[in-house]
Amino acid sequence: MPLTRRSFSKFAIGAALVPAPAIWTSARAQAQPIKLGCSLSLTGPLSSVKAGLVGYEFWRDDLNAAGGILGRPVELVVYDDQSSAAGIPAIYSKLIDVDKVDLLFSPYGANLTAVIMPMIKQRNKFIMGMFGISNNDEVKHDKFFQIAPWGPKASSDWCRGFFDIAKAQSIKKIAILAADAEFSKAAAAGGEKIIKEYGFELVLNQTYPPSTQDFSGILRNLKAAAPDAVFVCSYPPDSTALLRSVTEIGVGDSVKLFGGAMVGPQYASLLENLGSSLNGVVNFHTYVPEPTLRSAGIEKFLARYAPVAKERGIDALGHYIPPFYHAAGEVVAAAAKGANSLDETKIGEWLHKNPVDTIVGRITFDAMGDWTERRVLMVQFQGVANRNIDQFRTAGKQVVIDPPALKSGDFIPFAKARG
């Protein structure tokens, strides 16, 4: 049966439990599985995030091989949300009331997560947030924990690194281009706050429909405003269209810094398709293979991920989403073991008080469930060639400019970086 919201056909990734290792007793082997539930964008415009499923699966398989959580195996219950918020409340109601899952992962991103947060708070459920921005700012749910490294005060500060670069380059005038969508609007609003804080002049603040493919008129407005920097808040389809338009039309000679909050240039398919159109762009990321970021945990994960990605035809690199989806599982397991319970209140209380070591590093959560330390990367694309995905597996193509502690190279002004 196809995966649709209407049928709620369960994606068969966890129904068959991993065989119990020999060290399990028969009582343990017969224990009821602990169910972790979520929706995932397996189809639709956000389907690149389905690579995160591999992160969940690796975590589940390794955990079950080691004895599970509290002596019980872990099962994943995942539904396709088709990249649409419309069916997500019904999916999560089903996960809670019909599937009786023990703990939840959110959908991907701010747009899809926003529609369930009131229900999650009302039902008092524990949930791991998967890359949304500011989803807990209004709800203030004490059992929400964000796996992305946005840091505290994420609504404004998650992209602060972009503006720190602007400040270092003596930027004076900034323009904002933002899609009319939850994530992009939140990012733009955060950018406005920092622009005001840093004393920059906001010369253009333009919102456009997320379906926009022709950016010629917007780029004409941009050139007329003559900004020194352009802060872009976009999702994959409009990120692609905008960068192609920039290559064809340009942004004007005044622009030294371009990018910031573009979702899309983290994914292998867009990197390969856009190629040299990316040069000079400075944009957020969570992991790139620069020497300042390499670690044994990430290296091992990516080596294991590569053949699976090739077999399934998913994101070839797996840098952005998959390691953090694995880490989300690690956080849940550590909290349940630390609390010695599946009681959601106890798990939440434990996480607010204790750090968790994961393949993406040590994570400590604040009162809002965000990381206590911002670890968002601002990377600049430099010397990128066309149609060569392997170049992104090596250092030097996505150079870390910010934060300073992880810097791996020097910033190059936009026009110069584009040759």
Feature locations, PLM:
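N-terminal export signals
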Residues: 7-26
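C-terminal segment of N-terminal export signals and the immediately downstream linker at the start
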Residues: 22-40
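Extracytoplasmic "Venus flytrap"
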Residues: 37-57, 79-86, 108-109, 177-186, ...
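Short, polar/charged alpha-helical segment
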Residues: 46-70, 190-194
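Beta-alpha junction/loop-to-helix N-cap segments that form part of ligand/metal-binding clefts
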Residues: 48-54, 69-139, 208-215, 240
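Extracytoplasmic ligand/sensor domains, especially the bilobed periplasmic-binding protein
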Residues: 101-205, 256-283
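Extracellular/periplasmic periplasmic-binding protein-like sensory domains
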Residues: 246-326, 392-396, 407-418
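Solvent-exposed, acidic/polar segments of extracytosolic/periplasmic ligand-binding ectodomains
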Residues: 279, 352-419
